[in-house]
Amino acid sequence: NKPRSNIETVNDLDGDVVNLFECIRRDPERLGRLVYFTPYSRETYEATYLSEIPKDPFERAARFLVKCNQGYGFRTNEVRVGWKRDIQGRERAYAARNWTELPEGIFQAAERLRGVQIECRSAVGVISRFNAPNVLIYCDPPYVLSARSGGKRQYKHEMTDRDHLELLAALKRHQGP
């Protein structure tokens, strides 16, 4: 919800995340329609792990959204974590309802991504490239593995302790606020 800056860049090493952003920006109606007509179902979720990765970028983005939103923990790696379902006794149903609200979220994201540059590079490389006093960096790396319950891997591109130290050094060198 922040106001736009003159130059904005979004970066993620995960090509599926970048593909999702590109599809949202290029044709949010098409992606929204795909999600709208995709059922919230265990079989749909399971199929994302059993089928080949679609060549069509919009089908690939919809598949990625199913994995992230219909499974527990929003994991982006290829580890199946189980289908997220609503159960009796909770204060409200949320899993299926959140899925039905996702197409509207796609349109909101499309509006926000207008004019934004999308990168798929290492965070250290992007931070170095944008090292200027008037550049604000918002950095949201994966948690350190040792700080996670059981050291579970969640992301397609995890960071080692050394990677975290390199990122910290790059952020400390950055001239901006």
For each predicted feature, which ranges?
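Conserved S-adenosyl-L-methionine
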Residues: 1-40
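A generic structural signal for alpha->beta connector loops
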Residues: 5-7, 115, 175
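Acidic side chains
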Residues: 8, 12-16, 131, 140, ...
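SAM-dependent nucleic-acid methyltransferase catalytic core
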Residues: 25-138, 142-152, 166, 172-173
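Long, positively charged, glycine-interspersed low-complexity recognition regions
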Residues: 157-177
